[in-house]
Swiss-Prot record:
Subcellular localization: Secreted
Note: Is neutralized by the single-chain antibody fragment 10FG2.
Domain of life: Eukaryota
Domain LCN-type CS-alpha/beta: 1-66
Upper taxonomic lineage: Eukaryota, Metazoa, Ecdysozoa, Arthropoda, Chelicerata
MF GO annotations: sodium channel inhibitor activity; toxin activity
Family: Belongs to the long (4 C-C) scorpion toxin superfamily. Sodium channel inhibitor family. Beta subfamily.
The keyword Secreted is assigned to this record: yes
GO cellular component: extracellular region
Disulfide pattern: C12-C65, C16-C41, C25-C46, C29-C48
Chief place where the protein resides: secreted
Record's function text: Beta toxins bind at site-4 of sodium channels and shift the voltage of activation toward more negative potentials thereby affecting sodium channel activation and promoting spontaneous and repetitive firing. This toxin is active against mammals and lethal to mice. Selectively modulates Nav1.4/SCN4A, a sodium channel present in both denervated and innervated skeletal muscle.
Organism: Centruroides elegans (Bark scorpion)
Protein name: Beta-mammal toxin CeII9
Amino acid sequence: KEGYLVNHSTGCKYECFKLGDNDYCLRECRQGYGKGAGGYCYAFGCWCTHLYEQAVVWPLPKKTCNA
């Protein structure tokens, strides 16, 4: 599974500005989904890869980003 890393309290994607390989996104994806996850910056959001099927990614149901 793949998807955008989401902040569960705000419903927003994690923003990033250095597109492609991005240490911040990789670190945040691994922290949120486990050390087997990958991550990079895609369309100014942290995109996480190699997630388990039940992983919760953006958008959250019934929660829109209100940042």
